[in-house]
Amino acid sequence: MKLQPGREAVVRVAVATLWATPEAVRPVDRPALAPRTDIPAWVAGMDTDQRVGECVLSQLLLGERVLVTELRPDGWARVVAVEQPAAELDPRGYPGWLPTAHLAPADPAAPAGEPLVVDAGVTALHAAPNGPVVVPGVVLGTRLIPADGPVDGWRPVHASGHPGPLWIPEADVVPLPTGQPEPGEVLAVAERLRDVVYIWGGVSSHGIDCSGLVHLAWRRFGVTLPRDADDQAEATAPVPLGEEHPGDLYFFARPGRPIHHVGIVTAEPGGDRRMLHACYRQRRVLEEQLPADRAATLVAVRRV
C-alpha cells in the first residue's frame, strides 16, 4: 500500500511534528525530520527563541490518523490531523505538513481491540522483551492495540507502520478509559508534566505549549479536545467566575482580541486563583497564582 491523496494514513514515529510549510523548516529541525525522529535532541538543540518559532503548528503521536490531501515528490505530505479538531482552520481537523517518512497508509485490516494508552511520561517500543529499541521516545497519551497478554512484565502491542508486535514495559500502559474522567484525575496527569519545556506547537512530554497541555491531559483519558485554545473554549461549558474548581480551564484574551492562552485551574474557589499551564514567559510548565497582568486578561472559565 502507498500513501495517496484523499486517503487516510497513520503516524509511524513516536512524535511527528506538523509544519506550517516544508520551506519553514530550519537546520536545527533535522532531528525532528529524520525517519526515526529524535525529539529530545531537537528540543535540546534549540535556543529559547527557536523553541517558540511559529513554523511548528502541532505534533501528532504514534498511531494518530491523518487525511492526506497532497503529496509532493520531495517527501512531504499535506495532511489534516483528524484527531485534533480545529474548527477555525478546517472542519476536518488541524491542517499542516508532515514528512512522508513519518506516515504509513492506513490499513483497513489492521488489528483491532480495546486500546491501551501510555501512562509513562516517556517510554519505548522494543523488538522483544528487553530487546533492541524500535520506536524510541513514545510519550504519554499514545494509544496502542494489545497483541496479546503480558509476558514477564512486558506487553506485546501493535504499532502503526511496523510489522509484527512490538514490546512495551507492562507498567507503562493502562487500558484506555471509556467514561468521562474526574477533573482531579486529569489535573493529576497534567501535573506530571511540570517543568516540561515550552515548545510552540508541542503536544508531548518532550515539549509542550498551553493548549497542547490541555489537549494531551484529556487525550490520556480518551477525551478528544480541540488543539487550539480558542477552539477549546468553544468546545467546553461555561462556569461562572468564582465557581471554578480544580480541573476547570481558565482562558485569557486581550481586549478585542481572540483567546491566546489557557491554563488548568488548581485551586478551590474562595482563595487565590491558581493554575497549571505551559508558560510562554517562563518557557516551561508550572503551577502559580495568576499574576496581576494575567488576571486582567482572564475572560472565561470553562469545564470539560
Predicted regions and their residues:
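...with weaker cross-activation on analogous glycine-rich loops/strands in unrelated enzymes
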Residues: V223-R284, L290
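Active-site nucleophilic cysteine motif
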Residues: A190, G201-F221, P226
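Boundary regions of SH3-family modules and the immediately adjacent low-complexity/disordered segments
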Residues: M1-L33, T48-E54, S58, L62-L67, ...
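Loop/turn positions that initiate beta-strands
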Residues: G63, V135-P146, P246-D248
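Low-complexity, Gly/Ser/Thr/Pro-rich intrinsically disordered linker/tail segments
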Residues: D293-V304
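Residue-level "contact hotspot" at macromolecular interaction interfaces
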Residues: Q59, G137, P240-E243
